[in-house]
Amino acid sequence: IIEFLNMRVPTGDVNRKNLNLHHAVNITDAFMRAVERGEQWDLRDPNDNDVRESMPARTLWQQILEVRYRTGEQYLNFIDTANRALPHTMKAKGLKIHGSNLCNEIHLPTSEDRTAVCCLSSVNLEKYEEWKDSTLIRDLTRFLDNVLQFFIDNAGDEISRARYSATQERSLGL
């Protein structure tokens, strides 16, 4: 996690940097409780869940906040909060959010069968007065849905999990 946190900090080994990746860190309720209580926090290998190191949770939290202060990133993804807010229809299917997209705008469930897919666009709210009475939002929504349908119709078998998710959810973001 420490290397992940520091990959956007401009100092240090250039081979360990990725200044163009805009990423989030999952923050759990358990971690925040450990911060509040001044407890140790185990750093686990995501591949085998083995503890690789332990450190004070407050020290890790301070590092997260210092990197955010210096770089504006990484985004904080309060993952347990996201799962509590998951629609009941998705909870009933046993679905769970494991992360967000890189910039943390969307929270969609993922599993062995699904890879989150969402077609995103944006509008310039500074120009709201120019388009507020137009069909812009409807047209953009239709456009995004058409892009999603094009993806579904043309996605290869190597990304079948993404195609399945797009078909099941039709997630759009504007």
Give, region by region, the residue ranges found by the protein language model.
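Active-site cavity-forming subdomains of large catalytic enzyme subunits
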Residues: 1-130, 157-164
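A generic short alpha-helical patch detector that favors 3-5-residue windows
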Residues: 112-115, 136, 169
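Short coil-to-beta-strand
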Residues: 115-119, 142, 172
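Long hydrophobic segments that form regular secondary structure
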Residues: 130-138
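Core structural elements
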Residues: 143-153, 163-174
